[in-house]
Each structure stands twice: as C-alpha cells, then as structure tokens.
Regions:
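NTP-dependent nucleotidyl-transfer catalytic core
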Residues: 1-158
C-alpha cells in the first residue's frame, strides 16, 4: 500500500517516502489548553489519529509526538478571568481534552510533552536564535526574523 500526502509547498499529492522505513516520526502541534476543547481542536486530532493508524499499519515503528501548550498569554488571561491558577486551569482543560480524545477513539500519542516541562530548553534555543541573528526581542516578545533565513518554511531543522 502506497501512501500519498499533499505537499503544502507544491499543493500536489506526493508519495510518502520516509528517510528510514523502520522508524517514522510524526510531530503534531496539540492544543493550547486555555478553554474547553471545541470542534477546531477535534478536526486535527482525528485527522492525525487516522494518519498515525495508517502509518502504523505500513511501518514498523511510528513515533507520534503531540504537545500540549500549557503556558501562554491566553492561558494567563483566562486564569486571571476565572480567578484560578494557570496550573489548575491547564490541568482541568487538559483533562477535558484527553477525555474528548478517548471519546473520539483517538489513540494516545507516543509522547505528549507539556510546554512547561521544557521551558529551560526553549529559553536556551531562543537565545541561540537571537545570537545567530534569526530572532530579535521587541516589547517583551521574541520574533523570528524570517528574512534572515532564506529557506524558511522548507527546513528549520538546520538553524
């Protein structure tokens, strides 16, 4: 069985040919847990669950990583509006999201890291981007300098 996926850069269907047929890696941006899950959260959840199941049928090892963003401006604002801690808010909303996953019969990802578990690494990576000139600070935010990276969108792995 061949697998074809749409390449967003060319907008054409292309055969999926992995670099290593024994190990497939799949990273999916998960929810930002500031409010109860909605249909917009369910759509990518179901689509990538189907892809995960198809890939597992064809390949030996499929590693599926889906993060949970449990700290950001929306979370802080929502926790302040509800007068609860960000931790209490994100735990409640994460539980609701995971309950919805089970209800939709979606398999658990191989790994489900939370943003707060990797803050130190993120700070280190952000500082490296700033040091290399790929990012800059403005008004207490850090922005990626797209113009400084000619292959932006093609391959960010080499930064």
């Amino acid at each position: 069985m061949d697998i074809f996926l749409t390449n967003n850069l060319t907008n054409k269907k292309e055969q999926f040919v992995p670099r290593d047929k024994k190990k497939i890696g799949m990273y999916v941006c998960g929810p930002t847990v500031y409010d109860d899950p909605h249909i917009g959260n369910a759509r990518p959840l179901v689509i990538f669950d189907i892809l995960f199941k198809v890939l597992k049928e064809k390949f030996s090892i499929v590693t599926y990583v889906r993060n949970i963003t449990d700290i950001d401006d929306k979370i802080i604002k929502s926790s302040e509006e509800q007068n609860i801690s960000t931790k209490d808010l994100t735990e409640k909303v994460s539980k609701n999201f995971l309950d919805d996953c089970k209800f939709l019969n979606c398999e658990d990802p191989t790994y489900q890291p939370k943003a707060t578990e990797h803050i130190d690494l993120m700070i280190k990576m952000i500082n490296e981007l700033i040091d290399k000139g790929f990012a800059y600070e403005n008004n207490k935010h850090v922005y990626f300098e797209v113009k400084k990276f000619s292959d932006y969108g093609l391959s960010l792995i080499h930064i």
